[in-house]
Structures are given as structure tokens and as C-alpha cells.
Amino acid sequence: MSTTGDSANREKAAAFLSRLQATPVSHFIAGQWQPTDGRECFENIEPAGNTSLGQVISGTTEDMDAACEAAADAFPQWSQISGQERKRILHHFADLIEERAEEIALVEASDCGQAIRFMKQAAVRGAANFRFFADKAPEARNGLSLFQPDHTNYTLRQPIGPVGIITPWNTPFMLATWKIAPALAAGCTIVHKPAELSPLSATLLAEISERAGFPPGVWNMVHGFGEIVGKRLCEHPAIKAIALVGETSTGSQIIAQGAATLKRVHLELGGKNPVIVFDDADFERALDAVVFMIYSLNGQRCTSSSRLLIQNSLKEKFLAALIERIGKLKVGHPLDPDTEVGPLIHRGHFDKVMSYMALARDAGATIAAGGYRPEDLSSGNYVAPTLFVDANNTMRIAQEEIFGPVLTAIGFDTEEEAVQLANDTAYGLAAYIWTKDTGRSMRLAQRVEAGMLWVNSENNRNLPSPFGGVKMSGIGRDGGDYSFDFYMETKNVCIAHDSHTVPVIGA
């Protein structure tokens, strides 16, 4: 049933979306929106009812070449602008994001199906990303002074050049700002290739860039498909690095496509992240975190804790409480303020997630909650929040990234067994530990194979901290100076003192 808030949000969203539906959504290259007449388009389908949100220009190799060349042409000017001026422009960009916060939230929720209660934070987090890296822009080039007798060594950090940014369809606005802000703060120019399944927030970002004060060509954006424009972005010789948030298989392709031009790559990829709950955990807080970290954002979050490793002495009580909580989750339209779980991004992904229900049964697991599409939401890509029990870690439901509101619960007895289960996967992005035993948490922090580990917390983000995975979950780190390590080159300068004697030969 539609609520008053739901109706108001739908009316506002329709008004914002009408502008984006009036003509095909186009590319932004060298400070100009590209002509749409006569161009091949693809349909942008929204996930709540599988209806059209309009047409999007399908980018070509020529479009991507133009964007890469524009970024290369703009790089000399942008890279030499002072850090203070970049700081000013990036803060202005953040101001402009905040001015359009409601539009961003409503468009994002409509385009990718994330619940509006979470997408209200999209602009807040996006602006925070820009402000954080804006403040770091003046110090981005700072290096080190390295002592050596008879010589003075110091390092310089310089922007690597034009870079490619490839972003996914889950929370696309925030993730785009997370990748783009440090690149611009470092002095790089960018070519943004957004996911074709959620193109609208990238369009809003490009619109904001028009007003922010960037020289033409600093910010470029090309819509389209990975096998065409994404591939060309990775191959183009003007592009010096590629930053991706996406699937592990896509990361492998990007490495191969960029190999001929020796592209630097930063890959933030998939995960099958464990949440390990010991019997001494704070029961209610652990329960809250388990529910939040798999069912919020529709389970379409790289750091989702999709494997619950629960100590057997607590298992029966915890699973009973978990099943009760799952039954209370509100599944509904993403623009309904009460909705906690919205639709999956597109029908193909819905079919993939639903296929794991049969896989679970065939493997001997039990579906303790969910496992179906709600009948009253049959026009959209909705999956009822699902829990698999009676599972073991060899099952596909415990090894593969399902990327939906689907949790697999597995029991363990000892700390050693918990570590073995946690590490028995190809992935290593994140892990969560719930225990009151400080010594145990410190031991597991050393032994669990993950790029990030939270103890007695959900995935709290601290912008200066490193973000990234190990194993098949990625290469490199984001956050603070870790981002600058990727977007910048380090140059060593060695100056001899008068006391230095040059070796003499042939005299």
C-alpha cells in the first residue's frame, strides 16, 4: 500500500526524472554535452517495475577516444593548478552536491532500486568524500626528506596523468565520488565510465562538474557497455591508470586489456565476507549488525557479511532471533520511506540470485526464511530476505558472491575452526568479529585473510583509513594518502653536497 511519504517521493522523483527522459542521456566530453540526434541508444530500465526511465546514448570507440584525448589535453593545465585552487574547486563541488541532495537521492533510488532511507545519505557521503580530499589537495605533492651522507635526497609526488574511473551499479553516486575526488585532488584528469545499468547519477555528477569551475576536459563521462567503451578506456594509450569498483571477472579483463600499455590498476572487487559471532558476543548488537550488513542496500554491497559463522553453543538461540528479525523487514518500493529492502538492479541479476534457492536445496541446505519473490511485488525484481541454514562451507551458497539479500549460516565450535572457515574462500575483502574477548579479537585480526576487519561493529568507514581487499577481492587501497599512492607517481631527487667526490676513470 502506498504511504503519504511514498506518494510524495514518487511525485518529486517523477519531476526530476522527466528532465532526464525528455531527450536521450548523453556523454560529457571536453566540457560539452554531446549531440544525441541519430545516435544509437539503449533503454534504461528501473528495477521496481521494470519500466523505462528513458534512453541513453550507447557510446562508441570514437566517443571514448574523444574523451581520453580531452583528458590528455586538459592534464597539463589541471596538474599545474595549485593545490589551494584545487581545494577551492573541490569544496565548491561539494557545495553543489549538497544543493541537489534531494534530487540525487530520489534519482539514485529510482535508477538502482536502493531504498530512499539509505539513498538520503548519498549526497552527504559524496560531499564528504570531496571535502576530505579537497582539504588534502594542498599537501598531495608532499614527499619525504631522506638522509644520506654527502647527498640530500627528497621525494616529489606528481599526478600520474589522465585516469579512467569505472564504477558499478550499486550505490553508484557515492562510489563514483569516492574514486573521482582523490584523482582530481591529486591533479589527474578523469574519464568516467559508469555502469550502463544505473547511468543517471553519473549524469548528475557531470552536470555538477559544469558549474564547479573545472577547465574543459578535466571531467569527462561516456555512457555505454564495457565490451566497447570500457575496453577502449582500458586500452587507450593516453590513460595512465584504471580504477574499478566491480566484479572480480571484470577486474581480470581490465588487467588484460591494460597490459599492452602497462596501465596501473586499482581493483575493488567482490567478496564473500564472514561475520564471526562467538558465544560471548553482545547478543543484541551482534544481531543488529548481522541483519544490517546483509539486508540493507538489498544485499548489493561489496562488504556485505554474506556468511554468518555462528558458534554452535549460541547457534540455536541466535538463528531463532535472526529468523524473527528477517520476518519483520519491510520489502517495498525504493521511494517508500518505510522500505528497508528494495528491488535488485535488473531482471538478469534477479534471476541469478533466485537460482541459488534451488542450488541451496539441491546441496542439502534449508531455506529458513525468504527464498521467494513477494507476490504483491511481482512486477519488480524483489527477493524476500533469505537465510540458508544447515549449510557447510563447501556449498556454492557459501563460496560464491550472490550479491543479494541472502545469508548463509554455518556453525563452528572452536576459534581455530572459525578461522579456517573464514579463510576458506577465494575472496578476502572484509570480515567482522563479534566477541568480548580482546585477546581473541587481536588473534583473529592477525589470522583472518581480509583487507579490512571490524570488531564489534558494522562496516564503519573512516576516510583516512585504507579500503581494499586481498586474494580475489582486489588490488590496492583507497582512502587518505593510500589513494594518492595510486593516482600519483613518486620521484626521487638526489642533490650532491660539495663534500661528495665523483669517481674518476679514464683520467
Give the ranges of each region predicted by the language model.
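ALDH superfamily catalytic-core signature
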Residues: A241, S249-N392, V455, V502-G506
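Structural signal for hydrophobic packing residues in well-ordered secondary-structure cores
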Residues: F75, S79, A94-A101, A105, ...
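Short, well-ordered beta-strand elements within core beta-sheets of diverse protein domains
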Residues: S52-G59, A74-Q80, G164-I165, V275-F278, ...
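Glycine-rich loop-to-alpha-helix module at the N-terminal edge of alpha/beta enzyme cores
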Residues: T51-A140, D150
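Hydrophobic face of amphipathic alpha-helices that form TPR/SEL1-like repeat modules
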Residues: M1-A48, Y372
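Residue-level signal for inorganic ion chemistry
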Residues: N50, R86, E108, F130, ...
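Conserved C-terminal structural/oligomerization subdomain of aldehyde/semialdehyde dehydrogenase
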Residues: T51-Q55, I239, I276, K330, ...
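Rossmann-like NAD(P) dinucleotide-binding subdomain of oxidoreductase/dehydrogenase enzymes
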Residues: N142-R285, F412
